[in-house]
């Protein structure tokens, strides 16, 4: 038969109680050391005997470091799990204040839109009227300011466009002058290469063809100048020889 569960209760015998405490204490310290080494855990063990004697073990360099870490963790844990009741009460009061302010603002907005005016007195209506006039004046002032700024910006753009237009116009005039200069230069070069107009070269008549006419082969008399050919002979100089022989016969 297996053993049943051991019932834990206080040892009445003082000596047995001290012996058991000593054994269990050493075993507990040993187990704490083993878990700190095997599992790389931070372990802190504090034991007080019945006589108030302190026995402790710390895997950290100091027991105080582990205790401070424990206190920080415990405080943060309590802050999350146990919210402050005073803060809750303050939140409730603040919610009521904010809600009343919101209701007042919504009511004022509706009155500015001309709604829910039945409950207002004459004085309240006058105040509302002054408020609307002030708002309208402020709106008009802001509108005029924006219009002036817009006009000023447009004037600046207009001035900039005019300057750009002037620059482009000057560039076009410069290019036009360059083109005209190139055209004039080309014309002058063409005129210089063309020969000047001169009188036509006279066409010389070919030399007369010699004939077998006996009259032309006779010697001239001494002292007699050579006779000039008649116009008919000059004209006949261009005729073929056989025509010349026929004419002389």
Curated annotation (Swiss-Prot):
Residues 210-236 have a biased composition (Polar residues). Signal peptide: none annotated. Residues 1-61 form the MADS-box domain. It comes from the Eukaryota. One of its GO terms (biological process) is regulation of transcription by RNA polymerase II. Its main location: nucleus. Residues 184-249 are annotated as: Disordered. Residues 88-179 form the K-box domain. It holds the Pfam family SRF-TF. Keywords: Activator, Developmental protein, Differentiation, DNA-binding, Flowering, Nucleus, Transcription, Transcription regulation. This is MADS-box transcription factor 18. It comes from Oryza sativa subsp. japonica (Rice).
């Amino acid at each position: 038969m297996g053993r049943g569960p051991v019932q834990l209760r206080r040892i009445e015998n003082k000596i047995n109680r001290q012996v058991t405490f000593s054994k269990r204490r050493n075993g507990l310290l040993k187990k704490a050391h083993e878990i700190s080494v095997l599992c790389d855990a931070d372990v802190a063990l504090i034991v007080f005997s019945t006589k108030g004697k302190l026995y402790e073990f710390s895997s950290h360099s100091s027991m105080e470091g582990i205790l401070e870490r424990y206190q920080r963790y415990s405080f943060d844990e309590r802050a999350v799990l146990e919210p402050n009741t005073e803060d809750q009460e303050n939140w409730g009061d603040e919610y009521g204040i904010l809600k009343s302010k919101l209701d007042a603002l919504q009511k004022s907005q509706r009155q500015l839109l001309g709604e829910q005016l039945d409950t207002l007195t004459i004085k309240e209506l006058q105040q509302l009227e002054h408020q609307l006039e002030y708002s309208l004046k402020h709106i008009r002032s802001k509108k005029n300011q924006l219009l002036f700024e817009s006009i000023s910006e447009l004037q600046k753009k207009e001035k900039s466009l005019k300057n750009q237009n002037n620059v482009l116009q000057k560039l076009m005039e410069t290019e036009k002058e360059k083109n005209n200069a190139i055209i004039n230069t080309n014309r002058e070069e063409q005129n210089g290469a063309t020969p000047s107009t001169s009188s036509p070269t006279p066409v010389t008549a070919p030399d007369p063809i010699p004939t077998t006419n006996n009259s032309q082969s006779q010697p001239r008399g001494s002292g007699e100048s050579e006779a000039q050919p008649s116009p008919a002979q000059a004209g006949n100089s261009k005729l073929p020889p056989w025509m010349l022989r026929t004419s002389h016969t």
